[in-house]
Amino acid sequence: MSKVSFKITLTSDPRLPYKVLSVPESTPFTAVLKFAAEEFKVPAATSAIITNDGIGINPAQTAGNVFLKHGSELRLIPRDRVGSC
């Protein structure tokens, strides 16, 4: 089984820290979101992953699908930043 890698940046931190995660293509993207949130010590239940263009990603798909549709560079945003003006 092949793997895909994502560079996930935490946008709520002014230093823009990032983590590179490699997971099997068939991994549910919800698991990637949960793991990334835990790595950054933010609550997974209130976080979202978006593309660098600001497009939200539906986590109900495989990591392989997300990689093919959106590429490897993604951003993690805690919900206190989602939809706020």
Swiss-Prot record:
TM ranges: none
GO CC entries: cytoplasm; endoplasmic reticulum; nucleus
PTM note: UFM1 precursor is cleaved by UFSP1, promoting its maturation: processing of the C-terminal Ser-Cys dipeptide is required to expose its C-terminal conserved Gly residue.
Predominant place of localization: nucleus
Cross-link (Glycyl lysine isopeptide (Gly-Lys) (interchain with K-? in acceptor proteins)): G83
Superkingdom, natural source: Eukaryota
Record's subcellular location: Nucleus; Cytoplasm
Propeptide: 84-85
Cross-link (Glycyl lysine isopeptide (Lys-Gly) (interchain with G-Cter in UFM1)): K69
GO BP annotations listed: brain development; negative regulation of apoptotic process; negative regulation of protein import into nucleus; protein K69-linked ufmylation; protein ufmylation; regulation of intracellular estrogen receptor signaling pathway; response to endoplasmic reticulum stress; reticulophagy
SUPFAM superfamilies in alphabetical order: Ubiquitin-like (SSF54236)
Gene3D superfamilies in the cross-refs: Phosphatidylinositol 3-kinase Catalytic Subunit, Chain A, domain 1
Keywords: Cytoplasm, Isopeptide bond, Nucleus, Ubl conjugation, Ubl conjugation pathway
Keyword Oxidoreductase among record annotations: no
Entry's family note: Belongs to the UFM1 family.
Assembly and oligomerization: Interacts with UBA5. Interacts with UFC1.
Main function: Ubiquitin-like modifier which can be covalently attached via an isopeptide bond to lysine residues of substrate proteins as a monomer or a lysine-linked polymer. The so-called ufmylation, requires the UFM1-activating E1 enzyme UBA5, the UFM1-conjugating E2 enzyme UFC1, and the UFM1-ligase E3 enzyme UFL1. Ufmylation is involved in various processes, such as ribosome recycling, response to DNA damage, transcription or reticulophagy (also called ER-phagy) induced in response to endoplasmic reticulum stress.
Protein name: Ubiquitin-fold modifier 1
Organism expressing this protein natively: Rattus norvegicus
Encoding gene (name): Ufm1
